[in-house]
């Protein structure tokens, strides 16, 4: 058989694998994606949602850098909804409910029509390693495929085990085979493997649900899209519905806990803390009875409904008994029962910030194999891994996004340096620079990285560069124009503001007043009809200028610590006085800067002072 040679191989066809494959191929590399089943490429295994606090920021950042998830969700969704509009700009986001069927079928179509990319259905059993460098893979069919770099985005399929009640069987997703040999191959090459667990709720037949007993929640006809390149006049407004558990639900759940695999001990691994099962909610909050339950249609092409909030791996009879106590679900028919899945993963402390393995050169990891949870988390890691695999194949330095530049950087930095006892989910609270890393300003802060990566077309880069110039020029103009007191007060009165000015003011300062919007300035100065994302940016940067400046000062301090480099072969045992726990963490992670060292669990300020003193 002819030798099969590629530049980048991607193992896995989920959200991480999709972004990695597209990134490598779009950068001109001959790439191959391996998937267990062609028909489940880009499958949304759990909820139909894209976005959420922190997650939406990841999607927006990928969009600016050249990723696909944002624009694909804009095209193939059932609704987009604005969240946290009453809060500050750091919290405002868009959340999408994707059409799960169209999302995956159209993504497969996109992949099949992407130049430089081949898609192959087969199970990868081994990685080929020579002299500490990855050389390719071996599949279940015994075929060897060679490549300069390999990206592993295996999801929940490494020794995956499905659990429903007291029933357990091997599968990476319900109805699909697991990959039983690959994690053993990784162990053979010095990579540590551990296990996590995640779970999903039952799916119901829409025709059996009484929606009249629930609150209907519609999306926005004219939303902020995930991608600023999306040109769409009107969006779908297919509703979701809200209901609640009751005291009877909790009573039944408590009776059924004896059958829960997390109580019986069948499941011993940890699941995502921020997406707990109903079993876990009842155990942790036994006195709370009204947990929210959202009913979300999975696709316009099916009658299947996702029951968000009722995640459980209890046996089928227990799932049905609990559902019967919820308003609107009294007669609901189950199409798929909820289940848990346990799987192997490789703790991300074994990676560089490029997502390349420290143990095997040219081997990259992305998504749940790194101990993360969520489509968006997997996708952004896949994108970065795919970009850096392509760059390594070209002999280029990796692209690194640090935690002051994006939530992508926060996620990667956290999973490498801060081990958690459960799958990692990105959250705004994990970032020190939330006001800087807003959902609405990814185009401002990541434009330089987008140019460096080189996936976006010259037309899109020009559009971004021009948009940034408009924002900066307009802010400077508004800060220079004065408006008389009488005219300014007339505008404030018209807008319902209680504030009264005692002298004239610059328009930039007037815009800082709560009730004043950029569009309302048309009464006192000439303004242009810029796209909404530009007007929003002008307004936010002026209104929150002092807070943004304070955060920028913190970022400068962070950057200075990042600039103090630590040699790659540095021997931390030479530094006297460092605590044992710090030394263990430093030797495991092998940080490349003082800033990175300071974020390792167990490393104190005193340890950093000793390290800095030694390096000087």
Language-model segment annotations:
Residues 4-16:
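Beta1/beta-strand and adjacent pyrophosphate-binding region of the FAD-binding site
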Residues 4-6, 140-149:
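Core beta-strand elements of the Rossmann-like FAD/NAD(P) dinucleotide-binding domain
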Residues 11, 144-155:
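Short hydrophobic core segments
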Residues 22-126, 141, 153-173, 177-183, ...:
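Conserved N-terminal/central alpha/beta ligand/cofactor-binding core
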Residues 39, 183-320, 328, 408, ...:
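An anion/pyrophosphate-binding glycine-rich loop and adjacent beta-alpha core
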Residues 128-144:
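Conserved beta-strand-loop-beta-strand element in the redox core of flavoprotein oxidoreductases
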Residues 306-372, 400-413, 531-585, 590:
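A glycine-rich dinucleotide-binding beta-alpha-beta segment and adjacent secondary-structure elements
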């Amino acid at each position: 058989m002819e030798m099969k040679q590629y530049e980048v191989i991607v193992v896995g066809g989920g959200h991480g694998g999709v972004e990695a494959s597209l990134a490598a191929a779009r950068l001109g590399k001959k790439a191959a994606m391996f998937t267990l089943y062609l028909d489940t490429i880009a499958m949304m295994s759990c909820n139909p949602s894209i976005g959420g606090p922190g997650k939406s920021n990841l999607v927006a950042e990928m969009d600016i850098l050249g990723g696909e998830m944002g624009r694909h969700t804009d095209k193939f969704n059932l609704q987009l909804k604005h969240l946290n509009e009453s809060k500050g700009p750091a919290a405002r986001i868009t959340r999408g409910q994707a059409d799960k069927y169209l999302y995956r079928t159209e993504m497969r179509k996109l992949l099949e029509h992407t130049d430089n990319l081949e898609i192959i259905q087969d199970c990868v059993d081994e990685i080929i390693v020579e002299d500490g460098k990855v050389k390719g893979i071996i599949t279940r069919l015994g075929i060897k495929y060679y490549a300069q770099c390999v990206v592993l985005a295996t999801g929940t399929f490494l020794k995956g085990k499905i659990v429903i009640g007291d029933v357990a069987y091997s599968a990476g997703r319900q109805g699909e085979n697991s990959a039983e040999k690959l994690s053993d191959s990784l162990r053979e090459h010095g990579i540590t493997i551990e296990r996590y667990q995640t779970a999903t709720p039952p799916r119901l037949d829409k025709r059996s649900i009484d929606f009249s007993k629930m609150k209907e929640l519609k999306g926005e006809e004219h939303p902020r899209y995930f991608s600023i390149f999306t040109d769409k006049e009107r969006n779908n407004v297919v509703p979701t519905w809200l209901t609640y558990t009751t005291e009877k639900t909790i009573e039944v759940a408590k009776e059924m806990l004896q059958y829960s695999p997390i109580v019986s001990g069948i499941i011993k691994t940890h699941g995502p803390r921020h997406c707990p099962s109903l079993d876990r909610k009842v155990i942790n909050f036994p006195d709370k009875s009204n947990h929210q339950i959202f009913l979300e249609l999975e696709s316009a092409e099916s009658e299947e409904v996702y029951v968000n909030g009722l995640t459980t791996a209890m046996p089928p009879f227990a799932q049905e008994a609990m559902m019967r106590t919820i308003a609107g679900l009294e007669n609901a028919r189950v199409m798929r029962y909820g289940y848990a899945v346990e799987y192997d993963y490789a703790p991300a402390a074994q990676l560089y910030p490029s997502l390349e393995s420290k143990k095997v050169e040219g081997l990259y990891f992305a998504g749940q194999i790194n101990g993360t949870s969520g489509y968006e988390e997997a996708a952004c890691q896949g994108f970065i891994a795919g970009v850096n695999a392509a760059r390594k194949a070209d002999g280029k330095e990796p692209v690194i996004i640090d935690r002051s530049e994006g939530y992508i950087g926060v996620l990667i930095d956290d999973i490498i340096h801060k081990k958690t006892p459960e799958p990692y989910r990105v959250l705004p609270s994990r970032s020190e620079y939330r006001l800087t890393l807003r959902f609405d300003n990814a185009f401002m802060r990541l434009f330089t990285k987008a140019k460096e990566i080189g996936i976006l077309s010259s037309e899109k880069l020009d559009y971004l560069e021009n948009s940034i110039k408009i924002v900066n020029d307009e802010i400077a103009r508004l800060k220079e124009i004065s408006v008389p007191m009488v005219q300014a007060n007339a505008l404030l009165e018209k807008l319902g503001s209680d504030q009264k000015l005692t002298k004239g003011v610059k328009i930039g300062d007037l815009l800082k007043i709560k009730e004043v919007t950029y569009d309302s300035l048309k009464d006192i100065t000439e303004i242009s009809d810029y796209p909404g994302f530009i007007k929003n940016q002008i307004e936010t940067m002026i209104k929150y200028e002092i807070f943004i400046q304070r955060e920028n000062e913190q970022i400068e301090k962070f950057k200075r610590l990042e600039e103090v480099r630590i040699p790659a072969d540095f021997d931390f045992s030479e530094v006297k006085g460092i605590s044992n726990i710090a030394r263990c963490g430093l030797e495991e992670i092998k940080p490349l800067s003082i800033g990175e060292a300071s974020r390792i669990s167990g490393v104190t300020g005193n340890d950093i002072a000793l390290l800095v003193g030694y390096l000087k």
